């Protein structure tokens, strides 16, 4: 009895370690959203021009997730995590030292390389190390690391950038990553590659219409979200006319609400993943459509950001659950594809927001994002009725 108890504690501790790593990786992915104005000022550029960095980062991840995963499919996972953290840390040092926007983009590409591998293996590792029957909860814990990156990492990174310069934000992330690396070395066991799949897995996965439908849903809904979210900081200051401090508070609210979404999914995700995801997409649609009307009031924007954060966390978790349920025999390949497709959506959304801001008006980003959100809602209803599946069923 004691052994089992200790075993469960150790299992959860390892999952928590991965959650901390997720926090670090998502902090660096999200933090430029809160630093666009500062970086633009530093390099004498427009905010929308700097925003293209978000698209470059996301599309590098999208392009490299599957190739890197296949290249490292036989590498022991603990060793792989250590190596990618070394690349991650070195790239942040370069971000700190960057003397031009081009160098900053190059450093972000290095981070994106590490990101591409990390997110293709993390979800399956969390499920693998979780106590029996706690797979959805393990995923929820990883997602909590993601949410904390938004509720703590992004606002703190923005505050550091405001008071000490945006370079110090990236340097601080590098320090945090180094500490996390030491923890990984200490706590994680040897993790031989299991069920990672190979290039031979791709035709099999592509012949699963339910899985392909989930991938399509993912890219559409993520595009909708990032069309507006990528430029929420300049939107709050330049369109709504509120202070930089309120922009920080709004990002804090949105991230904190993500934790609520994580808790909701942890309790209901095993049984009601499909219904939760469709409801969350509908909620996202409403939030995007109301973004500009809500911009006349700090309270209205605050309430909207809470529902927005809840919706996106449930959507992200739900998509992962579906992918893992539909590809239990090739989890790493399936998640590498998912990570790549998710980042195609991030890059597409950031690019659409960039073009809307440059050639139309930044005030329209919510309305434009609502269009793919509506398409995603209809598609989710169709596919979830046709292919209902939960994580615990592990149905192909």
UniProtKB/Swiss-Prot annotation:
It holds the Pfam family MFS_1. InterPro entries: MFS, MFS_dom, MFS_Efflux_Transporters, MFS_trans_sf, Sugar_effux_transptr_put. The chain crosses the membrane at residues 15-35, 50-70, 81-101, 103-123, 136-156, 170-190, 209-229, 246-266, 275-295, 299-319, 333-353, 364-384. The keyword Plastid does not apply. Its main location: membrane. It is found in: Cell inner membrane. Keywords: Cell inner membrane, Cell membrane, Membrane, Sugar transport, Transmembrane, Transmembrane helix, Transport. It is a multi-pass membrane protein. GO terms for molecular function: carbohydrate transmembrane transporter activity. Belongs to the major facilitator superfamily. SotB (TC 2.A.1.2) family. This is Probable sugar efflux transporter. It comes from Escherichia coli O17:K52:H18 (strain UMN026 / ExPEC).
